[in-house]
Structures are given as C-alpha cells and as structure tokens.
Amino acid sequence: MMKFSFALVSIAAILGATQAQAQAQDCKYSVPESQLVKKGTLTMSVNPTLPPLQYVDQTGTLKGMRVELGEEIAKRLCLKPEYVRIEFSAMVPGLQAGRWDMINTGIFYTDERAKLMQMLAYEDQAISISTAKGNPGKISKLEDLAGKTIGVELGGFEERKTRELDKQLTDKGLKGMNIRTFENFAMSFQSLRAGQVEVALSIDSTGAEYQKRGDFERVLSGLFPTPVAVALKNKPLADTIAKVLNDMRADGSFQKLFTSYGVKPIDGAIVVKGPAT
C-alpha cells in the first residue's frame, strides 16, 4: 500500500512539473517577482462605475472591456489577475506607494501624469454630458451649461475639464456652473436621477450606455478627445506590458475586443511614456 501511495505521489509530482513546464513554455514574456507587488499576480486598481467598460454586475462580478483587457494581459504573462476596487482619487497615491502594479481604470493620458508614472495610451476616448430623459434643460451646446448644476467624479481629468469649461463660460460673461464632485461616476448619476444635479459628466462610452438603457439622455459628446491609458510605477514591467498589447494588436484580439464594445483603439503602436526610471 505504501509503495502504491508513493507511486501515486510520484506520478502527481511528474504531472505537476510537466504542466508547469508547459505553462512556462506558453509564456512569451517572464516577469521577475521583484517587479510585482504580489508573487505570481498582476494586481490592478479599478473603479468599476463606468459601464460598459468597467462595472459590477448583479452577482457582484467585475465586468467590462477594461476588465477583460487586464485579464488577458495577466494571462499572457502567466500571472493571476487580481483587482482592487477603489475610488479614482486614491489610485495614483496607491500606485506610488506600491499597493498595486497597474492602474487599469481608464486613466486619461496627460503629459503631467507621464512625469509621475509609466503610461501606455491604448484607447481613444472623450467626454459626454448627460441629462434627465427628455433633456428638460434644452441643452444643445456648451453655452447652455451656464448656470447649471453639474455632477462629476472627484480628482480626475473630467473634473479638471469641468473647471476649465466653467472658466470658459465666465470668461464669455456667462454664468458659471455649480460644480458638485462625487467619489465616483455612479454617485454622480444617482444624483442626476434624484434631481440633485441637472447634468452629469462622464466618458463617451458610459454616456452612450446609459442612453441605450433609457436611463438618461446624452446631449453632448465628443468633448475634449484624449487617449486613455494604463499606468504603472515599474518601467520594466510597463515595457513588457507594452509588448503584450502590441502582440494583441498584431494577432487581432485587441481590435476584436474593442469592436465588441464599440470603442476605438488608438492608431499606431502602444508605447511607454514616463520617467526614465
């Protein structure tokens, strides 16, 4: 019996080693443990309040294009994908503190951010303005936002552009907007539904999704077009992920994923822009 048990253990060990070897051979790129927050894991931060690109379904499961993209990156690196759900305002400090490897929440690319982090722009995106159904404020142009109460997520590109727009209005002699910031976009749209704000600002994909559902009306779109990126602290890891994304472009899986969500990827190769070290 002992000999039989030992044989079973030996066979299991051989099979396990063979499986691990096969998996290693499937990995085109290897990531040293020193480049990761957690061994064998690609840890990513996400704020899942932007359907259809990143959201939580009725079962509590993370869904969306960006979630799938992160999972595919991890798969091609033979790493386990792990998401940390957190508000956007905490993401950059958390990245710098080493709490996660990558911000995968659709962070807009700016030159200022590229001075702080390794950024890989991969997606074309822009800003939308949504109102209650029927567009009660009759908003058809930016000037119609004068004097309106607008909801926006705190601390991001969207808030910055909202404040720039407010200045543009007042510089023209129009009334400024009453800007209300929220921890995330979901709370902003909940406030719009409750009539606490008159308009809500979001990305184009989310504004279109809410209109498709019949929840709100998207009255302005395509504002401030800017690429969206993933962001990392570790440059060697960022360089490796850029190679993975460009491999996906080459084999067609990148475009297939984007097309399924009606999103346009950037033109050209995906490159790393950030500090030298």
Feature-to-residue mapping (PLM):
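N-terminal hydrophobic or amphipathic helices and topogenic motifs
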Residues: 3-4, 11, 15, 21-80, ...
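Extended ligand-binding regions for polar small-molecule ligands
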Residues: 26, 67-76, 135-136, 143-157, ...
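Alpha-to-beta junction loops
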Residues: 43, 79-80, 97-105, 148-149, ...
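Short, well-ordered beta-strand segments
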Residues: 43-45, 130, 151, 200, ...
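Periplasmic-binding protein-like
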Residues: 48, 124-131, 204, 208-246, ...
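Ligand-binding cleft/hinge of the Venus flytrap
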Residues: 70-77, 158-181, 211-212
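Acidic, polar ligand-binding/catalytic clefts
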Residues: 71, 75, 80-144
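A ligand-binding cleft/hinge motif common to bilobed small-molecule-binding domains
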Residues: 89-93, 106-115, 161-168, 190-224
